[in-house]
């Protein structure tokens, strides 16, 4: 959940 454009396995963040 670090980058808004990468679907992080721990926290998918799409801002």
From Swiss-Prot:
Its main location: secreted. Residues 2-15 form the LCN-type CS-alpha/beta domain. GO terms for molecular function: ion channel inhibitor activity; sodium channel regulator activity; toxin activity. Inhibits tetrodotoxin-sensitive voltage-gated sodium channels (TTX-S Nav) in rat dorsal root ganglion (DRG) neurons in a concentration- and voltage-dependent manner. Lowers the activation threshold and produces negative shifting of TTX-S sodium current activation curve. Induces shifting of the steady-state inactivation curve to the left, delays the recovery of TTX-S I(Na) from inactivation. One of its GO terms (cellular component) is extracellular region. Belongs to the long (4 C-C) scorpion toxin superfamily. Sodium channel inhibitor family. Keywords: Disulfide bond, Ion channel impairing toxin, Neurotoxin, Secreted, Toxin, Voltage-gated sodium channel impairing toxin. Has the structural arrangement of an alpha-helix connected to antiparallel beta-sheets by disulfide bonds (CS-alpha/beta). The keyword Cytoplasm does not apply. It is found in: Secreted. This is Toxin BmKNJX11. Contains 4 disulfide bonds. It comes from the Eukaryota. Expressed by the venom gland.
């Amino acid at each position: 959940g670090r980058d808004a454009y990468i679907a992080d396995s721990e926290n998918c963040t799409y801002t």
